[in-house]
Amino acid sequence: MTSSFTDNDKQFLVRNLLSRYDKPIVCAEVGNMTGNSTRFFSTHIPNDSVFYSIDIRDHDIEVPDNVTRVKSCSLEWDCPESLDFVYLDGNHDTSHVIKEIDKYLRVTDTVSGHDCGHVAYALYRQFGNKDRHTELLLDNQCSSWIMRVI
């Protein structure tokens, strides 16, 4: 299976997310089918960081030793009380993504993800929630997105 996680996604994430961190962090990704984003994040976060990779399936992928793989639904995973960021690229169903965003914004101020075209309505719904002031960063050269509470 080929990945749609492209060099443009990687550049966008380095420039707008990962460059903010120079000390160890705790972060997570949801969805690791090909392992492409897993390998990318694991090599672009500071040394001694904690990186969780959550998926409902145990995909046969090669990942570095600094990755903690978790076989679980993202909504059922007992995540740490605090994350520096989470990257969503698992179930793209609108209601599921809305629930994921709500869940993870309780433990982080940065939720990001992939396939913005597939999850656009979920992003629109969250962005329209005036109870929580957020900014949404998109780039028309990639499919990744970043939502921050400000």
Regions found by a protein language model. Give the residues of each.
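A short alpha-helical cap/connector motif
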Residues: M1-Y87, N91-I150
